[in-house]
Swiss-Prot record:
GO terms for biological process: amino acid biosynthetic process; aromatic amino acid family biosynthetic process; chorismate biosynthetic process. Pfam families: EPSP_synthase (PF00275). Pathway: Metabolic intermediate biosynthesis; chorismate biosynthesis; chorismate from D-erythrose 4-phosphate and phosphoenolpyruvate: step 6/7. One of its GO terms (molecular function) is 3-phosphoshikimate 1-carboxyvinyltransferase activity. This is 3-phosphoshikimate 1-carboxyvinyltransferase. It comes from the Bacteria. 3-phosphoshikimate binds at residues 23-24, 28, 170-172, 198, 314, 341. Belongs to the EPSP synthase family. It comes from Trichormus variabilis (strain ATCC 29413 / PCC 7937). Keywords: Amino-acid biosynthesis, Aromatic amino acid biosynthesis, Cytoplasm, Transferase.
Length: 426
């Protein structure tokens, strides 16, 4: 297995970094551009395993896409809600967003569409989304367990109507239904039962739909109404840098007492993970905001924090990786749903922190991390890109940290380690 040794620094980080476009925005923009009538250009798009699986699936459905990674540009020739392909065998890898968005998209088609992914993808929850589609009259044939990949969807134009949806494990299913709803045969109302996790991603979806010309009415926190007959407008759209991926570079400033500036990303971002800046401020960092950048300056000593991370749950690993360097405990709450991500993320973070000698208490929905001197260790990443990226930051302050399977970052940030080593001057 490949490994990367992280060099511990005896000085603060001092760098300005450029971060590729947001994965979440790239995938949403790609879907609505595919549904729009005409040509859209997506600038600063993310090119990674996840986004490329998604783009390939859309192209297999008969919607022309031109990828230009050198310009970070995607051109989409939308078909106005039509799915030209009448049959497709679609593979999504481990891309949960692609899996859910493509599942919803083919419901607008009139054909036979098989979806599958890697073994871990077959374990990730799809049940509530496919149940809604079945309740709308769409036939789905499951090859294994009901509600899980692989399955074949027999598309017939999504009927719309009133649906109830559980979104306590992922909000991606809700986002998927929202984005196809304008092309339903009748108005659509989606009522979320119970807790809606990762609400910030749903807000992102609604904002992007509005940017492409479609309105969503939200009557309360858990009910959404979309009028049928609305249509996305093809357009030129610039995608902002990925706030989740920026978190690792800001964290590097935090643990080394240094300075990191990220261009083209501000607190006005539509991404929920921009809340990471608030967490760092509470831990003692200084956050400076310019017209088109954000800069984090780390303190001499990080402070502990007790934080609900439900709306920025992709950053649990980032906080976990720097928590041992705080002067008091770090408590992470309300993220039980991350047990169903690329890996069982709560257990993975707890296991690797204990491997480093850190005292950690695991909860059903989070963990408590005590300030602890860190021992050298090789970090298991569980094929999870965020484990690799987060624990690389730990190694900036403790000698002897090695990241196993660093190539797993290709899922969302293929050149992460190139940019990471450039940041630290190596």
């Amino acid at each position: 297995m490949d490994t990367i040794a992280i060099p511990a620094l005896n000085r603060p980080v001092d760098a300005t970094v450029e971060i590729p476009g947001s994965k979440s925005i790239t995938n949403r923009a790609l879907l609505v551009a595919a549904l729009a009538q005409g040509d859209s250009t997506l600038e600063n798009a993310l090119f990674s395993e996840d986004s490329e699986y998604f783009a390939k699936c859309v192209e297999q459905l008969g919607i022309p896409i031109t990828l230009n990674p050198h310009l970070a540009q995607i051109q989409v020739s939308g078909k106005g809600g039509d799915i030209p392909a009448k049959q497709a065998d679609l593979f999504v890898g481990l891309a949960g967003t692609a899996a859910r968005f493509i599942t919803a998209l083919v419901a607008l088609g009139n054909g036979e569409y098989r979806l599958d992914g890697v073994p871990r993808m077959r374990e990730r929850p799809m049940g509530d989304l496919v149940t809604v589609l079945q309740n709308s009259g769409i036939k789905i044939n499951f090859e294994g367990n009901s509600g899980f990949m692989p399955y074949t969807i027999y598309g017939q134009q999504f009927a719309g109507g009133h649906f109830r949806l559980k979104a306590n494990q992922t909000s991606q299913q809700l986002s998927a239904l929202l984005m196809i709803a304008p092309y339903a045969q009748q108005d659509t109302t989606i009522e979320v039962e119970g807790t809606l996790v990762s609400q910030s991603y749903v807000k992102m979806t609604c904002r992007l739909m509005a940017d492409f010309g479609v309105d969503v009415t939200q009557t309360d926190d858990n009910q959404f109404h979309i009028k049928a007959g609305q249509r996305y407008q093809a357009r030129h759209y610039t995608i902002e840098p990925d706030a989740s991926n920026a978190s690792y570079f800001f964290a590097a400033a935090a643990v080394t007492g240094g300075r990191v500036r990220v261009n083209h990303l501000t607190k006005q971002s539509c991404q929920g993970d921009i809340l990471w800046l608030n967490v760092l401020e509470q831990m003692g960092c200084q956050v400076l905001e310019g017209e088109d950048y954000t800069e984090v300056i780390g303190p001499e000593q990080l402070q502990g924090i007790d934080v609900d991370m439900n709306d920025m749950s992709d950053l649990v690993q980032t906080l976990g990786a720097i928590a041992p360097y705080a002067n008091s405990p770090v408590i992470i709450r309300n993220v039980e749903h991350i047990r169903y991500k690329e890996t069982e993320r709560i257990r993975a973070v707890v296991t690797e922190l204990r491997r480093l000698g850190v005292k950690v208490e695991e909860f059903a929905d989070g963990m408590k991390i005590e300030p602890t001197p860190i021992n050298p260790a090789a970090i298991e990443t569980y094929h999870d890109h965020r484990m690799a990226m987060a624990f690389a930051v730990t190694g900036l302050k403790t000698p002897g940290i090695v990241i196993q399977d660093p190539g797993c970052t290709a899922k969302t940030f293929p050149d992460y380690f190139t940019r990471f080593f450039k940041m630290i001057g190596q």
